[in-house]
Amino acid sequence: TWSMLQLMWIKKHEPEVMEKAARAMFVKDYVRYQLTGVWTTDHVEAQGSLLFDNINWCWSEDLCRMSGIPISILPPLVKPTDISGHITAEASAITGIRAGTPVINGATDTALEAYCVGAIHENNCVTKLATSGTIYLFRKEAHPDPKALTYSHVVDGLWYTCLATSSAAESLRWYRDTFCKAEFAQELQGGKNTYRTLDEEAEKVPAGCEGLFFHPYLMGERSPYWDTKLRASFIGATAHHGRGHFNRAVLEGVALSIKDNFSLIENTVPIHEVRIVGGGGKSPLWRSIMANVLNRPILKYANDDSSYGSALL
């Protein structure tokens, strides 16, 4: 994401590297290049680079010129569903995959996670509880918004508006690693899953945590505030609050942060339900909190991994 800025940093701080650069690749495209020897990327990935022209559907010569990025190092563009190449004999010898096996181009994790949970129609909505948290709405036309990100989908004719909070499941991981070290050490020795323990304690606490609130701005915040200086905090703590309150406050704080973003799109089209993906969605309690905060049914699917979505393509 935002590869233009990364390439500009390299150009400024490591100019000798940029001078030698012949090809720029996204991570998945590099893996596919090693498998097939073919250098391509997809439009969804390209849009996230900030170097793509959404009007003419190609790399932007103007943006490349303004940023100083040679357009010649950017890969050819193909559809996510297109076959980019085939497994080479060399790759077959290393991986065991049959030589000649076709390899599709693929797309970004977000687009493929949405695809594998059936977000393929207008007005479908998906939320993601991973390191960061997202909420995205699919529509037939692009709706650019200065507070949001806009991408095309892997399904022709669909676009999605993407809004993101920077620390979703990352907030819970930070909380576990910082305040539950003993439990986590036991888990690593074959003991009970720490997240399950935290959920069980949080389930005993009423909604609202009896006045305890958590702001999940551990790494600043993206939408809707776009402020790197925002900071996380627990507010309203009293002697009455126990660990279960703090556990639940983290879950509720993340859900409310996603609600901040959802409020920008929830009244634009009818949204009857929200599909959920990501590791945080494995928690029944967190799903319940999300359903209450968003005031929508939350749909959980057995398979919601981007690799599964790529296989479906």
Role assignments for model-derived ranges:
Residues L172, Y308-L313:
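Short, small-residue alpha-helix embedded
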Residues C116-E122, L264-E266, V293, L313:
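Alpha-helix C-terminal capping segments
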Residues A46, T131-G133, A302-D305:
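Short, acidic/turn-prone active-site loops that include or flank metal/cofactor-
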Residues L51-W159, S166-S167, E183, Q189-R196, ...:
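ATP-dependent carbohydrate kinase catalytic cores
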Residues M4, M8-E14, K20, Y33, ...:
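A short helix-loop
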Residues T1-T108, L172, P216-M219, N247:
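Gly/Ser/Thr-rich active-site cleft segment
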Residues K204-Y308:
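Activation-segment/catalytic-loop signature of the eukaryotic protein kinase fold
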